[in-house]
């Protein structure tokens, strides 16, 4: 029984390492390319509070637009929302 413990322990450690490294985010030269939205803002943001925006990477699981406020806060928004589309059109 003791002879099975060592190979089993080694296999479990290797599996744990493989799982952790496979969940790495995208790599890129731009910081913007590595930002993905976990969740979206739930209410419309007034356009006077937003100074610019950028799109999240295509490698992200959820599509997103990062709105940068006049106070330099990054806020994720759902690009499918009507208010977000209007805001992006206004900023473009």
Swiss-Prot record:
Q: List the disulfide bonds.
A: 36-60, 37-76
Q: Which residues form the signal peptide?
A: 1-24
What is this protein's tissue specificity according to the annotation?
A: Expressed by activated splenic B-lymphocytes and dendritic cells. Low expression in lung, thymocytes, lymph node, and unstimulated splenic cells.
Instruction: Please indicate if the UniProt record lists RNA-binding as a keyword.
Output: no
Q: Name one GO molecular function term.
A: chemokine activity
Q: One Pfam family for this entry, by name?
A: IL8
Which PROSITE patterns does this entry report, sorted A to Z?
A: SMALL_CYTOKINES_CC
What are the protein's UniProt keywords? Answer: Chemotaxis, Cytokine, Disulfide bond, Inflammatory response, Secreted, Signal
Membership in a protein family? Belongs to the intercrine beta (chemokine CC) family.
Q: What is this protein called?
A: C-C motif chemokine 22
């Amino acid at each position: 029984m003791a002879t099975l413990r060592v190979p089993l322990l080694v296999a479990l450690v290797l599996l744990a390492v493989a799982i952790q490294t496979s969940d790495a985010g995208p790599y890129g030269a731009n910081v913007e390319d590595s930002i993905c939205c976990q969740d979206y803002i739930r209410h419309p943001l007034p356009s006077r509070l937003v100074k610019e925006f950028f799109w999240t990477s295509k490698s992200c699981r959820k599509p997103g637009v990062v709105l940068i406020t006049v106070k330099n806060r990054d806020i994720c928004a759902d690009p499918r929302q009507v208010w977000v589309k209007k805001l992006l059109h206004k900023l473009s």
